[in-house]
Design a protein with these regions (language model features):
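NAD(P)-dependent Rossmann-like dehydrogenase/reductase catalytic/cofactor-binding core
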Residues: 50-143
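Internal alpha-helical scaffold of NAD(P)-dependent oxidoreductase catalytic cores
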Residues: 1-68
Length: 143
């Protein structure tokens, strides 16, 4: 089997780009309990993706993409991985620790350190924290 690979001269930038895309896609798949591709069909999700992309591009230095480019790349990944279930959703569904601390919480820490306001990411963290806590408490509904 032939392996298709490409040498990356700026690996740090590629890591930051993957981080940025994962900060958008992964938590949304948990919140909406869906595969990646379904994010394109959920009302309001486009708006959240745009807001997160703006916040990330203002917070993560040397990402190499404008917020518009990050939106485009995120949508490309959503399309290319349409039938995939994000690792965060898989972990959440299996009652395992998610990588939220390494993604959106880390983004929040960088923003705080640099006095950058990222309200959409803060809302995402709050929603995920509530979902995870309710799951840990064995509560599946809000009654």
């Amino acid at each position: 089997t032939e392996i298709n690979w490409q040498w990356q001269h700026n690996i740090e930038q590629k890591i930051k780009q993957k981080f940025a895309i994962n900060c958008i896609i992964n938590p949304l798949t948990v919140i909406y309990n869906c595969q990646n591709g379904s994010l394109k069909n959920i009302a309001g999700c486009k708006y959240i993706i745009e807001k997160l992309a703006n916040e990330i591009s203002n917070t993560v230095s040397d990402i190499g993409w404008s917020s518009e480019e990050l939106i485009t790349e995120t949508n490309n990944v959503i399309t290319l991985t349409a039938t995939n279930k994000s690792s965060m959703l898989t972990d959440y569904q299996n009652n395992k620790a998610t990588e939220i601390e390494f993604l959106n919480k880390q983004l929040s820490n960088v923003a705080k350190k640099n006095n950058i306001d990222i309200p959409t990411n803060s809302a995402i963290l709050c929603l995920l924290s509530t979902l995870i806590q309710r799951q840990n408490d064995g509560q599946n509904n809000y009654n």
